Amino acid sequence: MALDILAMAPLYQAPAITRIGPKTDPSKRPADPLKPLVPSRTKLTTIEAKRIMSILDEAINKVELVTLLSYVASNREDVEGVLGEDIMRAVREHEEEAEEEGWLRDRLLSIELQKSSLSPLTQQIKDSTKNVLRLLLSNPQAARLLQMQTQSRSAEAQNFIDSLIELRGFLFEKLVTSPMEARDKAQFIQDINRQNSNNQQIIDTLENELAERMKKRNAEVEKENFVIQELKNHLHQVLKFSENSLLRTKQEAEKQQKADFRASQARVAKIQQEILQLQSQFYNLVMENREAEQALRKKKYKVETEIENWIQKYDTEMGEKQEELEDLEAVHKEEKIALEELKRRHKVLVEEFVQIREEREINSKKRMEAEQEMVRMVRAATLIQAFWKGYLVRSLLRSKKKRGKGKAKGKEKGKQKGKEKGKGKK
């Protein structure tokens, strides 16, 4: 049905600034403070409702495409490479048929004859529109690119699309509303109407009170206006009196001004005489000051000459001091270098001294150890000699025993000698 209506619409002639708004999404709508009027469901549950909404969405999509055919017809060069030859050929045929229909509609003569030729031409335009839609729907990319040219749609077409989107929102709300919610909504509206009638009665009562108070206020305003008028009259009299007083004051001021003018002329003459006297005094002071200035200039020149001589002397002395300072700095640098060399040598000597002292300590330790070792060796040699002597004595005694028995005295003497030798060894 929507396509039949748009098929009879003229092609687009001028760009519009309106733009298609997005389809109403029930799940993203802001919360309504009137909760009883808002459906509890946000999605369609029945197949019939989904089919109805899908048909309406498809119709809106097709309407959006059809309303942009006029833009394609007026901008062939811009969109020819995007839409393709088949779509452009169908658009040209549609444009020719639309122009022919417009020419027939513009003619005002022989209306009855034109009606007979207008009906088949209208049907041809419908068919061409459907053909262009079929080609665009078969090429989704071209359809998307064409839908991006929303600024090229006419204001009438945009209003029609907005109406369809609004119809879709109403239909969606109607389909998601259950019978129970519809009854609650009707009851809520009745309560609102009843409350509205009560509020209207209160408003009427308040309006009546307001009218009475306005009457009272108007009466008070009239009284205040009367008082204001009285005050204005009094003010007029005061102004008149003040004008007379001002005139008298002005006359007195003029008389005083004349008297002051005569007195001022006398003072001016006196002041002029004083000026002449002061000018003569000024001339005398200038002459005196010139002589003093010349003397001061001579003194200043002398002082400047002395200062210049002192500056030259100071520069000379400072140059000599600077040379001495440079010489001292050179000597200081040399001494500093020598000091660094001495520090380096001192560091080397300290390291050598530490090394020698460590070597001496090591040698002394070795010498002490050698002496201790020698003492131990001497003691060991002494012990070895003592044991060896004891061994020889014992071996001699054993040899004597083997030779035979000797005299008892001899044995006793031998034993005594052995005991003495053993004691001596010990």
Curated annotation (Swiss-Prot):
Cited Pfam families: IQ
PROSITE patterns: IQ
SMART domains the record matches: IQ
Main location, first listed in the record: cytoplasm
Oligomer and partners: Component of the nexin-dynein regulatory complex (N-DRC). Interacts with CFAP52.
Protein name: Dynein regulatory complex protein 10
Residues covered by the IQ domain: 377-406
Keywords per UniProt: Cell projection, Cilium, Cytoplasm, Cytoskeleton, Flagellum
Gene3D superfamilies the record matches: 1.20.5.190
Biological function: Component of the nexin-dynein regulatory complex (N-DRC), a key regulator of ciliary/flagellar motility which maintains the alignment and integrity of the distal axoneme and regulates microtubule sliding in motile axonemes.
Start and end residues of each stretch annotated as Disordered: 18-37, 399-426
InterPro entries: DRC10, IQ_motif_EF-hand-BS
Location in the cell: Cytoplasm, Cytoskeleton, Flagellum axoneme
GO cellular component, one term: ciliary basal body
Biased segments, Basic and acidic residues type: 409-426
Basic residues bias spans: 399-408
Keyword Ubl conjugation part of the UniProt annotation: no
Family: Belongs to the DRC10 family.
Highest taxon of source: Eukaryota
